[in-house]
Amino acid sequence: YLAGLEQPIDVMIHNAGIHLEIRHETADGLETNFALHYLAPFVITKLLMPKLSRDRTGRIIFVGSEGYRFAMWGLDLDDLQWEGNKYSGLKAYGAGKLAQLLSMHIFAKELAPYGATINTMHPGMVRTETGKDNGKLYKWYKRNFIDSRSAAPEKSAEALYCLGASTAL
């Protein structure tokens, strides 16, 4: 479907997110956090890069997270699937977000000749459904501590709109 798009793309926003306490795999056998936060945006960006506006106005925006810090010891390139290491939802989330952030630098070099911009933005703490399938303790903690201190999704949407539409960038 994506390869068949004919119009140029002005703005591409990668805004999917998930947090899982227990290791899950996609239908293709990939660890879900890594597939969603890194592999999917990477593949979609590579597929659609030729469609990005080449008139120095094309933009790619990754919705990142300070959660990349949960992978503070770096990516275990020998175990991106979390098959050998003990699974940690926070570390898996961090690994996916760190890989996403690092890939942004690769894409920036590829896009430089066209003048397209690429940004990662941390939306802050936002009330979302992320983690809704986790256990009771996580749900309680999210409801009582995270969500009560989090902004409405519309606030993050304003920042995304600015990155996508501002002529100053």
Enumerate the predicted regions with their spans:
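A short C-terminal helix-loop "cap" of Rossmann-like NAD(P)-dependent dehydrogenase/epimerase domains
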Residues: 82-84, 136-146
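Proteins with a high burden of low-complexity, intrinsically disordered sequence enriched in S/T/G/P/A and R
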Residues: 1-5, 36, 137, 163-169
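Charged, amphipathic alpha-helical interaction segments
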Residues: 46, 50, 136, 161-165
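C-terminal helical subdomain
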Residues: 96, 143-169
